[in-house]
Amino acid sequence: MSSGGLLLLLGLLTLWAELTPVSSKDRPDFCHLPHETGPCKAKIQAFYYNPIYDTCLKFIYGGCEGNANNFKTMDECKRTCAE
């Protein structure tokens, strides 16, 4: 392959790497769990990461059990799973 072709390939690979979003494999596994209210009856506003929409959303947490895809703030959710 000519040096011009190699340079073009390197440029395209660099562009692809810059434009490709962070892979979901870099997120903790629990970010892919569905939100889970749990069996308790409290009505606590919480946030979970939704991998389909690649964003954090609100849900009502019951106050016990559930899973690790449960954050007290939107910022905490985004820092952990969405960035």
Swiss-Prot record:
Belongs to the venom Kunitz-type family. The record marks 41-42 as: Reactive bond for trypsin. It comes from Drysdalia coronoides. One of its GO terms (cellular component) is extracellular space. Serine protease inhibitor. The lineage of its organism: Eukaryota, Metazoa, Chordata, Craniata, Vertebrata. GO terms for molecular function: serine-type endopeptidase inhibitor activity. This is Kunitz-type serine protease inhibitor 87. The keyword tRNA processing does not apply. Residues 1-24 form the signal peptide. Keywords: Disulfide bond, Protease inhibitor, Secreted, Serine protease inhibitor, Signal. Its main location: secreted.
